[in-house]
Amino acid sequence: MASTYDTLTPEAQKGEVEIQNYTINFGPQHPAAHGVLRMVMELDGEIVERVDPHVGLLHRGTEKLIEYKTYLQALPYFDRLDYCSPLGMEHSYVLAIEKLLQLEVPLRAQYLRVLFAELTRICNHMLNIGSHVMDVGAMTPNLWLFEIREDCLNFFERASGARMHAAWFRPGGVHQDVPLKLLTDIGDWLDTRLPRLFEDAVSLFADNRIFKQRNVDVGVVSKEDALAWGFSGPMIRAAGIPWDIRKSQPYDVYDRMDFEIPVGTKGDCYDRVMVRIEEVRQSARIMKQCLSEMPEGPIASLDRKVVPPKRGEMKRSMEALIHHFKLYTEGFHVPAGDVYVATESPKGEFGVYLVSDGSNKPYRCKIRPTAFSHLQAMDFMMKGHMLADTTAILSAIDVVFGECDR
């Protein structure tokens, strides 16, 4: 009877084993996929040779649904795009409507928008930094950063009544004013709790040897490649390009704010995390300026063709009640035209191309998601890396599929 050794091939008897290429599915049911992403990967052993991302598993036809709603009814759809930073999505949409209407927004409303847009940025980065650190093997920082995120959600709830899907930014301003106690609480939080929790959490991993080994020189993108792939937000800033729409094309009161644009040097995963960490500090700086400079005054435009009458007025005036009913059923008519508005959302440039035919509903609303252009570079960034590095690269992109798939 032949021994096991005799049945082996000559190559195997010499101790040489040929590693064959094979194809695997990463996701869509995978905790590190950050949503319903399916990546078809071709591997040579553990080295990634090709990545083919399959998107669209969360496609809900948002752009088409918006065409059947009035301008105000379409607003909550934007909260459900990037559901980790909903107010960042609303911002582009309301600015686009205001540009078509040539609507003047009161100064207090602009300050409130900037305040909560930056709170949204902090909220988003807590989720991304925490989950990124957990994806590469650390648990504690994620739990600490989620305490800050919980504080942010509580502030959203106190301002709008909803923790996530706020629908608080409205054409002409914001839905309702915030109580003074909320503003003082946010100020106290920025001075004490936020820096303490945040810096403690960052100190656990920023200079950690294992964290650096998992992120430094992983998924490197040069300045030229970042521009060629259409990167924006922390992705392009990590590559060393100081591009920020809040500085280059300021909207609301960003032109009055004093803040720095953090940039990286290598364009790797470590730089992307560090850029987001510094962005949190800069956001806190902007919020403090908003709190100290915010004037008294109306929180929505005085144009009654767009903004509904006040609740007290409706109790006294039949005309105000009819006016309110008309605004919330028929909606307001927007002059014919088209406009593209982009804002600096926490993940990058979020754009809305809005086409009006003069009716009360958008003729077309094209949404420019931030992560779509980042995902197209997956093959470019992951090629030649180990399979374990793919989770770090994907997490550092910061992708949410509600926004990507629309």
UniProtKB/Swiss-Prot annotation:
GO annotations of cellular component type: plasma membrane
Chief subcellular location: membrane
Entry keyword annotation includes Translocase: yes
Iron is among the record's keywords: no
Gene Ontology MF terms in the entry: NAD binding; NADH:ubiquinone reductase (non-electrogenic) activity; quinone binding
Alphabetized HAMAP family for the sequence: NDH1_NuoD
PANTHER family per record: NADH DEHYDROGENASE [UBIQUINONE] IRON-SULFUR PROTEIN 2, MITOCHONDRIAL, NADH-UBIQUINONE OXIDOREDUCTASE 49 KDA SUBUNIT
Name recorded for this polypeptide: NADH-quinone oxidoreductase subunit D
